[in-house]
């Protein structure tokens, strides 16, 4: 069914199409229209970070920023769903146009800039959902928050989402918020992770429930930077790491829109992200699980991430290009 409507969808503006589909999914998931995307997916349970996942294929953050469509995405058979990135206060994001399809490259460039309705609205939507599966909530800082005060934004979000998340992702790797990637390095990283770890342990006592903290990193790090970051993750007892976010690289692109600013996702990111996963797993010595994401568009590309050492995988751009059938295909062949 998706292959029938995809040409029509791809003729429209990417962001308008995105908004249209989210509107349909959020409003129609309880009606017969949901039969267009509902599917049975094989059970391939895996336990990671103390959490039982029905299968290892998840939805990456960024598609459902405000947690409006959790129920619909669960009907597609995802093993877990990650919503956000969410910030303490609602913000409009960057100027439009800010989302570009590179169909010749099976890729997307985005410079959205953490557009979202704010953490309170996301929590309201999560509470209204009937979803009982594994939910990750991805948190970030507001654009106008100075870099030296970023910790306050992450702590504010963590405090509000903690009771409703199965894990919380700390997004310090989007290329579309000025200064954000600086938090991946040195004392900035250690200070942030240390503060969040302290808050996590306090919240775990308060709610009598331990919610893992996961850090999402960029693919554009040098090898020694990945190794230093891995040591910081171990030192601050993080529970997981997502590798990777979008890339600033434009190597080998064919599309006329290749020069647009923003983060690149999709097939061109495939090998770059897998290489980071391999290096991370080697440095971490499997003491911290890795969630692999970046260019997964087939059984083979998912298996490459798992072979590199990832315990779970996430899809986004491949899902946009191929639809829900990608989930079932990957899970059934793992």
Swiss-Prot record:
Domain of life, source organism: Bacteria
Active site feature: 174
Positions with a binding annotation for FMN: 61-65, 85, 138, 171, 216, 244, 266, 295, 316-317
Subcellular location field: Cell membrane
Residues given in the record as substrate binding sites: 65, 110-114, 171, 176, 245-246
GO biological process: one example: 'de novo' UMP biosynthetic process
Topology with respect to the bilayer: Peripheral membrane protein
Keywords from the named record: Cell membrane, Flavoprotein, FMN, Membrane, Oxidoreductase, Pyrimidine biosynthesis
Cofactor, how bound (note): Binds 1 FMN per subunit.
A single Gene Ontology CC term: plasma membrane
Pathway field: Pyrimidine metabolism; UMP biosynthesis via de novo pathway; orotate from (S)-dihydroorotate (quinone route): step 1/1
Reactions catalysed, as given in the entry: (S)-dihydroorotate + a quinone = orotate + a quinol
A family per Pfam: DHO_dh
Gene Ontology molecular function, alphabetical: dihydroorotate dehydrogenase (quinone) activity
Cofactor: FMN
E.C. designation(s): 1.3.5.2
Subunit structure: Monomer.
Homology family: Belongs to the dihydroorotate dehydrogenase family. Type 2 subfamily.
Function as written in the Swiss-Prot or TrEMBL entry: Catalyzes the conversion of dihydroorotate to orotate with quinone as electron acceptor.
Protein name as it appears in the record: Dihydroorotate dehydrogenase (quinone)
Organism: Idiomarina loihiensis (strain ATCC BAA-735 / DSM 15497 / L2-TR)
